[in-house]
Structures are given as structure tokens and as C-alpha cells.
Amino acid sequence: MRSEEEIIFKPVKTPNQNWVKELDHRHMDSSLSSFRAPKNDKRVITLCKPFVVCSKKSYSIPITLPLGLAYLGGVLEKAGYKTKIIDATGGKRPLKITRSQDNLYNLQGLNSDQILDLIDSNTFIFGISLMFSQEWLFHRSLIEKIKKKYPKIIIVAGGEHSSAMPEYILKDCPSIDYVIRGEGEFSMLEFSYNLFNGKSVSNIPGISFIDRENKFVDNGLSKRIENIDKLPRPAWHLLKPENYFNEDFSIGLMGGSRNMPILGTRGCPFQ
């Protein structure tokens, strides 16, 4: 594993700098109808929240249910796709913390081998949430192991780290086939539909990839969804909320409380 000093983060030149102000006016009901899964298709879309990486001096960091993946899972299921979520941080009790091989970091949740064992053999698309840049070295290693064991799986990365540095992670980890930047519901739905039906995904908003000529292709950040009230409810049944409650991890400030996250708005209100 390479040391942190070898990582060089390059800023992304976003084609449209006004993306935060631009809204996606499409209706989710219409997209759910247009991009439905093929009937009786047994292929699976697996979404994954990987383990948390933190300093060895920190016993734990606050962990919460993966709200973003729950919403994404809700959209995909509503469109008829067989969807599973691997929650490496809270999917199995007890929530364990192990030390990294270099003895510098704590890894909170299921390790790479345990995650590999949970991947359905019928998985066609594997979506992984990459949120924080300091976790990249470990999550890159996980992705490489997934591709080695399941070479035919299409791996797509989302989350803040992926959105901020798509070219970097695609070139640093060729095991990643695509990146979805920005809000993923509309993009992931159309992306899945096209792949399931053998169609091109090269022009879908929010998609980034390395083409056959080894050139980076970036379709920009997906627009902000105008009406989040029209999104399907989070697919909490694909997760195990009780594990968080039983381990005393919750959303509220009061220990031992039973609180669930909700979506009231997206993005920073101060831009």
C-alpha cells in the first residue's frame, strides 16, 4: 500500500460552475416508468458503504445509517431492480474496530474479506460510496480485491470523494469502471437501465469514465433534484437499523435514543 505522501490531489475543472444553482426538473415518476428493469431479470445491483477509516488515536467516530444509499436503493427497487445494500459499518454486530497493517489507523466495520463474502454472485453492478479522501488508500484496495474476485462486475463509485476527484480515482484505480458525480438518483437509474439493456452510458449526465483511447470523459456534475419530496422512501428494509440502536449509535445527541435520519434539504444552504 502506498503512503499518504504519494497521493497528489488535482483540482477538478467542472465544465459548468453553476451546477449548484441548476435544478433537475424531471419527474421521478416518469423516470421510474421510462427506466424500469427488464422483467424477470435475476441480475443484482449491490450498493456498498465500506468500512470507516480514522486515526488510531480515535477510538471511534460517529457512524450513522447510510441515508444516501437507502434513497438510492429505494429508487432502484421502485424501478424493479433487484437491489442489495452491504453496510460495512453497521450491517453486522458487534460493530468491530481493527487496526490497519501499518498500525496507523483504526478500521471500523467489516473488513475487505468479509465484504467480499457478502457480494451476491448475481451482482451485475456494484456501487460503492466513497465519502472521504483520507479513506481512499484503504477503499482502493477493497475495490481492487472486488474486481479481482468478480472481474465481470461493473463497478461505479459515488460520494463526495468521487465527485471531487473523478479523474484521479479512475486513473489511480482502473478497477473502477465509472463514477457518478453529484446527486445520483436520476443518473444511477438511467445508468442501470442502459447497462441492463446493452445501451451506451457515455452521454448520461453525471457520468465520468476513461474511454477506449485512455482519455478522461466527464459529463459534469448531475443537477440538483428540484423536488426531493417525490423521491421514493428510503429502503430501510435493505439495512439493519436495529444494529445501530443496539450499539448505541444514533442520529440524535442523546445516547441510547432511537432516532432515524430524514432528508429535509440537500447541499449547504449557504452554498
Segments (PLM) and residue ranges:
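Radical SAM enzyme core and accessory elements
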Residues: 1-47, 121-122
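Residues that mark the start of a beta-strand
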Residues: 42-44, 82, 258-261
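Glycine- and acidic-residue-enriched helix-capping/strand-helix junction motifs
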Residues: 56-69
